[in-house]
Structures are given as structure tokens and as C-alpha cells.
Amino acid sequence: MKVAVLGAAGGIGQALALLLKTQLPSGSELSLYDIAPVTPGVAVDLSHIPTAVKIKGFSGEDATPALEGADVVLISAGVARKPGMDRSDLFNVNAGIVKNLVQQVAKTCPKACIGIITNPVNTTVAIAAEVLKKAGVYDKNKLFGVTTLDIIRSNTFVAELKGKQPGEVEVPVIGGHSGVTILPLLSQVPGVSFTEQEVADLTKRIQNAGTEVVEAKAGGGSATLSMGQAAARFGLSLVRALQGEQGVIECAYVEGDGQYARFFSQPLLLGKNGVEERKSIGTLSAFEQNALEGMLDTLKKDIALGEEFVNK
């Protein structure tokens, strides 16, 4: 199994590469790519960690050598948020980066599963889909927006509030990956109940958690380490499913039946071909139903922005 990380010299990319080097199954290959000249050195640094995962790093304009034979491609390349910016302010720079890298994926490893981490995910996934479609290689079961950070944050905050072990809480999060489009389904967490005020406060905190980190880092960056962990969790789940493990379920932002929007984050059963089954979002509380209806315009606009970027 070969995993490629594009944007591997950045804050998320380095954290993700470290976690994959220590946690990928024995015999896996890990390939790091970034435009930054330091990237081969990041791979040498990680190569000293004693795990049975082969690692190589590549830099420069051409990602081809890193992508050859890749089964999974995780894309974290782009610029990070600064205080006062929201994820959509990143669009102008990151849209071009994602378009360029996905064009290279389409050419070199068109059958790979692709996980898009680069923000704004609501829009960059639509860009990736349109690029793959133009190249004639789009498979909607193999393109994912990685929203796992919303899930791990939800798990952490709920466990803190309710005095639970974080490992025993799993909150499904649906919708998109910014602001009001992030919808944690708190009504579906087994064995935990919330007051209306707790639901309102938790939902808001989960939606604004990225800003919490940006402000706390005071201009020094955005959420890189927790995002690295989230991306590793998703990437490792995908690898296990591709290798035939049964019953692997993760939420991610994918093209579905279009019931809510063309792309929508929901629980997915993963398998040997990527998405095996898009699972139902289940029964929502009145608060959740209302929040879902209220976010769809925003989500659809985010998606249209990405489609237009490629097709203009």
C-alpha cells in the first residue's frame, strides 16, 4: 500500500507524515511531496524512525515521482489561516494549488483514493471533482473531503463536558467543513443527553474551533497538529478498508445522491473501492433539522464557487 502526502513540508503535512510513518501497516510505502526544497530532508529525518514503512521525499514543481503507484493521496498543500481570515479567504491561493496537484494525480495515479485536506474543503473538493471529470477519471467513490477534525473535536468537547473518556465518544458530524455548515449530530451520541443550551453552545464551539486555535496561536498559524492527527485517522481507516478490513466507518465530505447538496459530509462505510456505502444520517432533532436547512444555501454556494473555478 502506497500513501502519498502532498504538502508534506507544511505544519499539517509534517505531523501527518510522522503519524503515518509510525502507524501505517508494515510493508507500506510513504511518499512525501512539497514544493519546498526541505522535503527530501523531512523524509530522511522520518526514515530514522524504526518502523517497517519505506519513506521517500520529493520537492520541486513536479509531483509525478511521488505519485507513481500511489493507492492513497492526501493533499494538505496550501496557505494557512491567519487571525481575521475565515476559511474562504484562503480560496484565492489554495484553489490554484489544489487544481494543479489534482491534475497531476489524474495523470499519474488516476485510480488512487484522494483525501482533500486543503481549505476551504467545501470548495476545494468540488474543484478536485471537476478537474478529475475533465480528465475523464472521476470516480465519486474515491474522492473525499477530510472532515475528521470536526469529529475528533466533537468527541473531545463532549467527553470534557460530560466527564467521559474521549475514546468512548463518537459524534457523527454532517454537512460541510466550515462555520455553519459543520453540524454535529449530538442527539445521536449514545448514553449522553444534553440540555438545549448545551447543544447550542457545543455546536457553536465545534463550528468555531478552528478560529479558537488561530486566535490562540496569535498569528503563528492554524490547527496543524490536531489536523495532522485527524488526517492520519482518516488515511489509516482508508488503508485498512482498501486492504479488506470490514466495517470501517468514517464521516467524510463526498459526492452523494444530491439530496442536500452535490457534496455532503455523512457517515460512510469504506471498502476496497473507496466508498462502499453512503450511510443514512438517521433521525435528526428539531435543532439539527433546522440547522441543516439553514446551512444548505451556504454549502451550495461554496460548491458552485469550486465548479466555476475549473469551468470558467
Curated annotation (Swiss-Prot):
One of its GO terms (biological process) is malate metabolic process. It catalyses: (S)-malate + NAD(+) = oxaloacetate + NADH + H(+). GO terms for molecular function: L-malate dehydrogenase (NAD+) activity. GO terms for cellular component: cytoplasm. Its EC number is 1.1.1.37. Gene3D superfamilies: Lactate dehydrogenase/glycoside hydrolase, family 4, C-terminal (3.90.110.10), NAD(P)-binding Rossmann-like Domain (3.40.50.720). Keywords: NAD, Oxidoreductase, Tricarboxylic acid cycle. The active site is at residue 177. CDD domains: MDH_glyoxysomal_mitochondrial. Signal peptide: none annotated. Substrate binds at residues 81, 87, 119, 153. The keyword Transmembrane helix does not apply. It is an enzyme of class 1 (oxidoreductase). Pfam families: Ldh_1_C, Ldh_1_N. NAD(+) binds at residues 7-13, 34, 94, 117-119, 227. Belongs to the LDH/MDH superfamily. MDH type 1 family. Homodimer. Catalyzes the reversible oxidation of malate to oxaloacetate. PANTHER family: MALATE AND LACTATE DEHYDROGENASE, MALATE DEHYDROGENASE, MITOCHONDRIAL. This is Malate dehydrogenase. It comes from Escherichia coli O6:K15:H31 (strain 536 / UPEC). The lineage of its organism: Bacteria, Pseudomonadati, Pseudomonadota, Gammaproteobacteria, Enterobacterales. The gene is mdh.
